[in-house]
């Protein structure tokens, strides 16, 4: 009788795209290295000829991307886990801020744009944030 064991590892990759169907997202280039307790600003600017929704995703080491913040309303400040961002349409921006970083904030951060009712996301290239001990 033949017996075989097989181990399969599935790796999911997030591919970042700067420009999709006339839309583009640019964000702070990384890596960004800051000390614990420092403040953070990651810039995100977009271009699109359509109305859109903006998002920040975070991807921790060995994990998939997770939604951090989303904006559906202009000039509304969104907050989660100490992070905040405001969609400023006149500046085409959705900058991510945190006043006091923790070591656990080390991750890759992606700004994303979804055009109107479309399910397609246009992603920034991602910004690696490394938070170090003081």
Curated annotation (Swiss-Prot):
Which Gene3D superfamilies does the protein's record reference?
A: Immunoglobulins
**Positions of disulphide bridges:** none
Q: Where does the record say carbohydrate is attached?
A: 134
Q: Could you name the Gene Ontology cellular component terms for this entry?
A: T cell receptor complex
Q: Which domain of life is it from?
A: Eukaryota
The family database entries (Pfam families) matched by this protein are listed as: V-set (PF07686)
Signal peptide range equals 1-20
Region span, V segment: 21-114
Q: Which InterPro entries match?
A: Ig-like_dom (IPR007110), Ig-like_dom_sf (IPR036179), Ig-like_fold (IPR013783), Ig_sub (IPR003599), Ig_V-set (IPR013106), TCR_variable_region (IPR051287)
Q: How is it modified after translation?
A: Rearrangement with the C region would elongate the sequence with Ile-Thr-; which creates a potential N-glycosylation site at Asn-134.
**Which biological processes are named by the entry's GO terms?**
adaptive immune response
Its keywords, alphabetically, are: Adaptive immunity, Glycoprotein, Immunity, Immunoglobulin domain, Receptor, Signal, T cell receptor
Q: Where is this region: J segment?
A: 115-134
Miscellaneous comment: The gene corresponding to this mRNA is rearranged specifically in T-cells; its organization is similar to an Ig gene, with V, D, J, and C regions.
According to UniProt, the name of this protein is T-cell receptor alpha chain V region RL-5
